[in-house]
């Protein structure tokens, strides 16, 4: 799937991927790495998504993993106090060599709102 990650790397939206069964982080694109202050991929590889993205010690109560299905998106919104931003979240599941992978695209609603005000 390394070619797939190249597609997401330079998106303005934050994108992350994690193993649905183990919660292990697999990928954060450049926007997500900057948002969470990671200089390189080694800083998050193998860590749990809930530890890094929410600073929790166990899976998040609002985790959508159980709602995810291949070829469908689940959309929801959430404020993340770690980065002090509101996001529209688009989650899906892909299966790669039998491994269930969650991909989340986070659209920063605060930036969108600022842009609307600037260009109105």
Task: Say what each PLM segment does.
Residues 1-33:
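Sensory modules in modular signal-transduction proteins
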Residues 23, 87-90, 103-104:
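Cysteine-centered metal-binding/redox modules
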Residues 33-44:
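PAS/PAS-like sensory domain cap-loop motif
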Residues 70-88, 94-100:
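Per-ARNT-Sim (PAS) sensory domains and their PAS-associated C-terminal
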């Amino acid at each position: 799937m390394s070619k797939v990650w190249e597609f997401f790397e330079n998106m303005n939206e934050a994108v992350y991927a994690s193993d649905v069964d183990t919660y292990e982080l697999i990928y954060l694109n450049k926007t997500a790495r900057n948002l969470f202050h990671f200089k390189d991929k080694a800083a998050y590889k193998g860590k749990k998504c809930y530890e890094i993205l929410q600073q929790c010690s166990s899976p998040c109560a609002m985790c959508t993993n159980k709602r995810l299905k291949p070829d469908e998106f689940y959309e929801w919104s959430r404020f993340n106090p770690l980065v002090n931003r509101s996001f529209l979240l688009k989650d899906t599941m892909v299966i790669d060599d039998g491994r269930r992978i969650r991909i989340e695209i986070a659209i920063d609603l605060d930036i969108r709102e600022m842009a609307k005000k600037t260009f109105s």
